[in-house]
């Protein structure tokens, strides 16, 4: 498998999720399966079925995270500069509305709109990579082409 680029923060977050899932997998789900078995006939036991389904889902996620972490390449903060690169925080201004938005450019595995983390593989992320403060980018959106200006680029 090829290397998976992650920020230090993203790597640590995945490690934490893995620990929590393993704990859940080892204790909570196993206990639920045990309790459901004690209820008797497994063919019509919805608690048992639900616990087994969750066990499969959690087990799959554990394997996925372990694979990502074993192939992870940590992206360290680069030197301060005004170029948009992976891991940098960027502030952009919508040239039509004047609204400003700040987010961090991250890998697809770390993308989280609500945490202000924009995937470098998204249309906006792709258009911003390599750009500098003052540059203007155009992005196709469902409502038409949006124009943004890079206002600020920082490590934090």
Curated annotation (Swiss-Prot):
Highest taxon in the source lineage: Bacteria
Coiled coil: 1-32
Glycoprotein keyword on record: no
Name of the protein in question: Transcription elongation factor GreA
GO BP, sorted A to Z: DNA-templated transcription elongation; regulation of DNA-templated transcription elongation
InterPro entries with a match to the protein in the record: GreA/GreB_C_sf, TF_GreA/GreB_CS, Tscrpt_elong_fac_GreA, Tscrpt_elong_fac_GreA/B, Tscrpt_elong_fac_GreA/B_C, Tscrpt_elong_fac_GreA/B_fam, Tscrpt_elong_fac_GreA/B_N, Tscrpt_elong_fac_GreA/B_N_sf
NCBIfam families (UniProt xref): greA, PRK00226.1-4
Organism: Thermotoga neapolitana (strain ATCC 49049 / DSM 4359 / NBRC 107923 / NS-E)
């Amino acid at each position: 498998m090829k290397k998976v680029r992650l920020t230090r923060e993203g790597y640590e977050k995945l490690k934490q999720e893995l620990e929590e899932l393993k704990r859940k997998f080892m204790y909570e789900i196993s206990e639920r399966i045990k309790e459901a078995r004690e209820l008797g006939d497994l063919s019509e036991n919805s608690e048992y079925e639900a616990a087994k389904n969750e066990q499969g889902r959690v087990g799959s996620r554990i394997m996925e995270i372990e694979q990502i972490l074993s192939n992870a390449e940590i992206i360290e903060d680069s030197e301060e500069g005004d170029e948009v690169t992976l891991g940098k925080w960027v502030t952009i201004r919508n040239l039509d509305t004047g609204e400003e938005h700040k987010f961090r450019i991250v890998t697809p595995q770390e993308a989280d709109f609500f945490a202000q983390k924009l995937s470098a593989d998204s249309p906006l992320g792709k258009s911003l990579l390599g750009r500098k403060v003052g540059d203007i980018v155009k992005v196709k959106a469902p409502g038409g082409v949006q124009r943004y200006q890079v206002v600020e680029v920082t490590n934090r």
